[in-house]
Amino acid sequence: MAKIRVYELAKELNISSKELITLLEEEFSVEVKNHMSAIEDEDADLIKELLSGKEKSEKTKEEDDEIETTAKNPIKESINNKKSNKRDDKKEKVNTENAEDMGIITMTSDTITVKEISDKLEKSYAEVIKELMLMGVMASVNQEINFEMAEKLAAKFDMEILKEDEDEEEDLEDILKDNEEEEHLQKRSPIITVMGHVDHGKTSLLDAIRKSKVTSTEAGGITQHIGAYTVELNGEAITFLDTPGHAAFTAMRARGAQVTDIVILVVAADDGIMPQTQEAISHCKAANVPLIVAINKIDRPGANIDKVKQELTEYGLVAEDWGGDTICVPVSAHTKEGIDDLLEMILLSSEILELKANPNRKAKGTVVEAKLDKGRGAVATLLIQNGTLRVGDSIVVGSTYGRIRAMFNDKGRNIKSAGPSTPVEILGLSEVPEAGDKFYQVKDEKTARGIADKRKEKIRDEYLQSTHKVSLEDLYNQIQEGTVKELGLIVKADVQGSVEALKQSLEKLSTEEVKVRVIHGGVGAINETDVTLATASNGIILGFNVRPDNNAIIASERDGVDIKTYRVIYDAIEDIKSAMLGMLEPEFKEVVIGTAEVRQVYKISSVGTIAGAYVQTGKLARNAGARVIRDGIVIFESELASLKRFKDDAKEVAQGYECGLSIEKFNDIKEGDIIECFIMEEIKKKTL
């Protein structure tokens, strides 16, 4: 049912909002908070009838009084009436104009300067400052006053001031809604991202697709790299995001931008599944995006397609010709063999997905990439996901905004409009947005600016309140509050056997309240990619006999990702189980106080092995624990047996200095080893 705001109805009835609120409460028992509240149309019609009835009765009474007076002195009164009627008409006309002109002045923020409100009220600065002084407020032209003060000030000049609460954001919510009626939806082309291991031919495959489908009439093909492009097969378009690699894919997903419909997983026929291929598979599964496997380099002598298919089955991907549902297409980027088959499979998969959009609505989509061009200003590549975008439209992009001055397609041609699944490069934004930011078309540039300003304020507030990620210590509380329905884990170990054993044991811990899911498992040190995946999935990283590298530590501290390392699998399982049951009560916290690199090794018969080391970070302390890390894997854990600076014993050695050290019960130190020094710090018990 339609609704009308209180101030709109008051304006229509030519009465103040306060009078209307009083009338609603007394006559109709309708409670309203303020002038921005909305009431049903039925109530509005009743109020109109009531007021029109009162006006008629008052008018009848006035006419009766007028007839009575006229009867007493008809000639004189008729002359006076003519004059007064003219005056009244004139007065009524002025009042009507004033009522229309008064309108509603608005504030978009919590404060407004004296200069701005003076301009809105169309009063001189002196008049406004004088009124403020009478209200006990001393303010200069450039000083700000709050909304309550502005409201009182406006009332002094018979004006009404409103605060635009979340109207623009409400408009955006309407744009965000995808519950389109079926009759308005039309088929759209699929959006594809290419992923896979380094040197498996991702870029070569993209180039092969692009070159084979760009016609000779396009003056050498694509003249401008905009981060995405469209190719055609049998009259149907396919949009490729030219951002090979899973880093961009995950970074965009971490920002909430799900733009990809299908992922092409490139696997070299002569190399098989590699670590980055595993990560790409994990990313696709976590994002719940269908994938097509392109087995590349089939022209190479050592190509073995069946071996690749066999390895894929280990990750739950069974080829169609082996009785599964994973599409595998043998291709060669070098000879162009299988390119058309791959494109046909993409179109077939998109038909099954039934991808649709409504071109006859306000546009929305995602930023693929953006940059600052010296000659053109902020330049952004947008992928339109719904609606139609036109030159001249005003858009909000993340916390920036703008009016589209020019728009180019993937061939570098100037275009006036673009529909769903189309990549375009635009000019006209106030600032450079970030990849993954969503954009929405709004009614005008003023609205766009207002929304962008509010978003900047929100970002500032959110920055002050750090994002609360999942950690083992507060997992039980979050489960009880219902904020965690699924616990995502990234498992890294020194050998594959440990990864598999742990995955199986952890997934058995799932309960009705929370499901435990291992998003990714791999061998080797914990790296920045693992942290990025954990950030995107709001997961926890578990390491066994492995340590995080420096980049991973920095990223985890920045993003608030919890990294737990263990020596025994049983300890990890017990920790997760205890956290889920609310029994985890940590008593000690391990604090790494410094690291040193072994530069030289000396063997002394009576003493053992002495390492000459350089302290890279923090400090080394004599009574602290010590780990020997080789190629990112912990090979021994003990404590420092001795620590010397030149020939003297030292309690500690600071960063930037060299020292001599030995590890308790360990002599197999080698050059290049990293010695990690740590202490166990007692912390207060947490009640979960």
Curated annotation (Swiss-Prot):
Record has Cytoplasm as a keyword: yes
Comp. bias (Basic and acidic residues): 50-62, 86-95
Cellular compartment(s): Cytoplasm
InterPro entries with a match to the protein in the record: EF-G-like_DII, IF2_II, IF2_N, P-loop_NTPase, Small_GTP-bd, T_Tr_GTP-bd_dom, TF_IF2_bacterial-like, TIF_IF2
GO molecular function, one term: GTPase activity
Residues annotated for GTP binding in this entry: 196-203, 242-246, 296-299
Renumbered residue ranges of the record's region G4: 296-299
Main location: cytoplasm
All residue ranges annotated as the tr-type G domain in the record: 187-354
Region listing for G2, in residue ranges: 221-225
GO CC terms: cytosol
Region (G3): 242-245
Region (Disordered): 50-95
Cytoplasm listed as a keyword: yes
Stretches with biased composition (Low complexity): 72-82
Name of one Pfam family that matches: IF-2
Family: Belongs to the TRAFAC class translation factor GTPase superfamily. Classic translation factor GTPase family. IF-2 subfamily.
Function statement: One of the essential components for the initiation of protein synthesis. Protects formylmethionyl-tRNA from spontaneous hydrolysis and promotes its binding to the 30S ribosomal subunits. Also involved in the hydrolysis of GTP during the formation of the 70S ribosomal complex.
Name listed for the protein in its UniProt record: Translation initiation factor IF-2
Species of provenance: Clostridium botulinum (strain 657 / Type Ba4)
Lineage of the species this protein comes from: Bacteria, Bacillati, Bacillota, Clostridia, Eubacteriales
Name of the encoding gene: infB
